[in-house]
Regions:
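Helix-coil boundary and N-terminal low-complexity module in membrane systems
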Residues: 3-121, 130-223
């Protein structure tokens, strides 16, 4: 008889051939669990960045590379990126806060006619959303800080704009879905992050240097 053992790493099966149905169900269960973890750890709001970095790291390492354990990977990465993510949170909060300060009074004017200033602010918001859509996955993989992180983000946007746009659209779709149905928090964070990883990992591998980064992990280079 086939014995099944469930763990956060996945279903361990005594048979040599893994059942693809169980594998799929296990990954779906892990995505739901990660979505719940992300939601709980994001409740203080200021921890959203650290939670997102931890979510991305865990999705790639545990779900896609089948290494490490889910809880250990998530909370280790949450701690590792906590302070840096706070600084990033403040930058984006100030940026979008300033845009909102000038945009909200223009909403009534926009309803009665075209307001070039309002649409200019919307354009600036879209520009800000591009780096926001992948900055937390980036800090989960690379050790750039300050100006080096800004240069890296701009380089990726310049060379892989279509990928970044895809990530931004995924993020926007996920936010809209959660706003329309809060119960979607049970799966949206994990699913959006998983799909984003399919777009971002080929890009990140191009800039992962095993010979120059002492913190390089070998699974970074796996397909």
């Amino acid at each position: 008889a086939m014995a099944l053992v469930f763990s956060v790493k996945g279903y361990a099966m005594n048979s040599e051939k893994k059942n693809p149905l169980f594998s799929l169900l296990n990954q779906l269960g892990q995505l739901i669990l990660l979505s719940i973890l992300w939601t709980i750890c994001s409740l203080p709001v200021i921890t959203i960045g650290a939670s997102t970095a931890a979510l991305y790291y865990t999705v790639v390492k545990v779900l896609r590379r089948h290494q490490d354990s889910l809880f250990a990977a998530f909370f280790r990465e949450f701690r590792n990126n906590f302070l840096q993510s706070l600084n990033i949170n403040m930058v984006f909060l100030c940026y979008f806060g300033i845009l909102a300060y000038f945009a909200i009074p223009r909403l009534s004017a926009t309803q009665s006619g075209a307001d070039i200033g309002f649409y200019a602010l919307v354009g600036l918001a879209i520009l800000g959303a591009l780096p926001l859509s992948f900055v937390y996955p980036a800090i989960s993989r690379f050790y750039h800080k300050g100006g080096a992180l800004v240069r890296f983000l701009m380089m990726v946007i310049g060379k892989h704009l279509h990928i970044v746009l895809g990530c931004a659209l995924l993020l926007a779709a996920g936010i809209l879905l959660v706003l329309s149905n809060p119960a979607a928090l049970l799966f949206v964070p994990g699913v959006v992050c998983y799909v984003q990883s399919l777009l971002l990992e080929p890009v990140f591998r191009k800039y992962s240097a095993a010979d120059s980064d002492p913190n390089y992990e070998m699974w970074y280079g796996e397909n």
